[in-house]
């Protein structure tokens, strides 16, 4: 089959290889080529065990597994925000309108009962975050690839989407850019790159921003994409007043109709991603089951001990599993193939 793009890349590839005039910039060519095509490198030798999977395919599987969470998160973000706008409008309460607003009014009718309006509203907030995080993340990878004279790791594609999904919808874009840069440089590159890091770069960047800019990454104004509107997360409310005081049902939390970071709200969507990871054997079922057993045991222990000052001691394990970042962290962070456990015993622990 005649493929113009493939022919063009094959034509210019020699210039980026060996003693070609552009060989220094081979990592840039490599990331563009691998973005559209599978790697043409094949291991040869009679003693090598061959498998149908490689790093590129594994990372693509993880990336695709985030899609249910991504779309559910965008829809819920729009649903929460459009309901908030409706409440403010009925109460004749003014709210700030930032640069997102012209796009929102152009592409939506501000109807919280419209599936497409909710999805598009959420996309208007999430896509800029993802684009900025992706561009800065790949930029950091390219810089280190050029310095070290090696190929760009496909792991950056997964790190950027996981980091973007962990962001609050109102997070400033420059802070998102700073966070992914810190996560990749401090969490991975200073240890030598993919396969040598013991920290999860997405979590490293998220933790840095949580402590460096707490006003933007915690509190009550970060979770619904309406400037000036306050809404506590379900975990924050439960920690302060107990889970019995929640305005949301367990089903609301499981399906994802609650405020929160873009990727953490829908446990159902996250479980769809988990099914993909387990079916393709990218994730270890031992890690998933080990964390679940540990959660149940620890939760029952706190239930037995009890506390008059900390309402979280009384929360049953099934609530722990559907609020906060528990499900997202379990499925996409704990099972991460580089920083996660590699031995079967370690996966249980």
Feature-to-residue mapping (PLM):
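Long hydrophobic alpha-helical segments that form multi-pass transmembrane helix bundles
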Residues: 192-271
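A generic, well-ordered mixed alpha/beta core segment in the N-terminal half of proteins
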Residues: 142, 153-223
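Cytoplasmic-side transmembrane-helix entry/capping segments in multi-pass membrane proteins
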Residues: 150-159, 177-178, 196-206, 285-293, ...
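Structural signature of hydrophobic alpha-helical transmembrane segments
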Residues: 119-133, 170-179, 253-267, 313-326
């Amino acid at each position: 089959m005649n493929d113009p793009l493939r022919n063009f890349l094959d034509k210019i590839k020699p210039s980026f290889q060996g003693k070609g005039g552009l060989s220094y910039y081979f990592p840039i060519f490599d990331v563009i080529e691998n973005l559209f095509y599978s790697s043409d490198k094949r291991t040869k030798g009679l003693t090598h065990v061959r498998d149908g999977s490689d790093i590129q395919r594994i990372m693509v599987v993880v990336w695709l597994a985030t899609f249910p969470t991504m779309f559910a998160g965008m829809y819920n973000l729009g649903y929460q925000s459009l309901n908030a706008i409706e409440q403010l409008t009925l109460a004749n309460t003014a709210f700030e309108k930032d640069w997102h607003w012209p796009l929102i009014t152009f592409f939506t009718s501000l109807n919280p009962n419209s599936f497409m309006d909710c999805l598009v509203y959420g996309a208007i907030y999430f896509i800029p975050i993802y684009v900025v995080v992706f561009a800065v993340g790949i930029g950091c990878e390219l810089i280190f690839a050029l310095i070290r004279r090696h190929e760009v790791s496909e792991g950056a594609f997964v790190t950027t989407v996981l980091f973007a999904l962990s962001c609050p919808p109102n997070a400033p874009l420059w802070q998102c850019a700073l966070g992914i840069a810190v996560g990749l440089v401090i969490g991975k590159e200073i240890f030598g790159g993919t396969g040598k890091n013991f920290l999860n770069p997405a979590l490293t960047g998220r933790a840095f921003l949580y402590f460096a800019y707490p006003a933007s990454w915690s509190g009550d104004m970060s979770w619904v994409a309406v400037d000036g509107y306050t809404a506590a997360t379900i975990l924050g409310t439960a920690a302060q007043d107990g889970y019995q005081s929640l305005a949301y049902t367990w089903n609301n939390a499981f399906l994802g109709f609650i405020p929160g970071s873009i990727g953490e709200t829908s446990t159902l969507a996250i479980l769809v991603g988990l099914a993909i990871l387990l079916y393709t054997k990218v994730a270890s079922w031992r890690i998933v089951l080990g964390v679940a057993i540990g959660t149940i045991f620890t939760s029952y222990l706190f239930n037995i001990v009890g506390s008059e000052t900390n309402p979280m001691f009384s929360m049953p394990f099934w609530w722990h599993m559907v609020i906060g970042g528990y499900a997202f962290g379990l499925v996409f962070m704990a099972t991460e193939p580089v920083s996660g456990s590699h031995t079967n015993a370690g996966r249980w622990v």
